[in-house]
Amino acid sequence: MFQQVKTSEPSLCKERLETFRAMRGMTHSVLSTKVLHSYLGDLKKAEAEGRNLLTEKYARMDNRIPPLKTNRLIDDIVRLESRWMKELSQKYPHSLGAGSGNFELYLSCELETYSDETLKQYFSDVSRAMKEVRNLAEERYTKLFQQIGYSSIDEMDRNRSLID
């Protein structure tokens, strides 16, 4: 789906497909099997209907089309995920402190492409993490940075502080 997305500006992710895959993998790496199975169903359904969910997401981000869905869980998920991202940006200012300005818009538009069932399962994962005092964003970035050779976000942040 991603390769078919037409953008008005060049996309670094489209030029570096491995970066796109790493970021998508990071995003999904902390979600339950229930969420992933439901989302796979969303992707298969969209493909059968001739829809490209990524095209729809980016069209929403550019405000080219009206909202795809209204579901209170979208706002709830975005609020909780944003809280986690804010915590990370304060904790790791050199590696995660900047560039998150569009996070809420990006996530909201992404979630609009999910089915109600996938949103329900995703919210369940986020709620469980909150009760367990876990930060899913931190878990995602830990996995990503470990993939590229760092032992932790803290190590990445220390290295970035030497550059800044």
Task: Kindly give the residue locations of the regions a language model identified.
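A cross-kingdom feature marking solvent-exposed beta-strand/loop segments within repeated
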Residues: 7-31, 39-42, 102-107, 111
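Low-complexity, charged, repeat-rich alpha-helical/coil interaction segments
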Residues: 11, 18, 52-55, 60, ...
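N-terminal low-complexity, charged segments
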Residues: 13-16, 24, 46, 72-73, ...
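Repeat-associated, polar segments at repeat-unit boundaries in modular proteins
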Residues: 36-71, 126-160
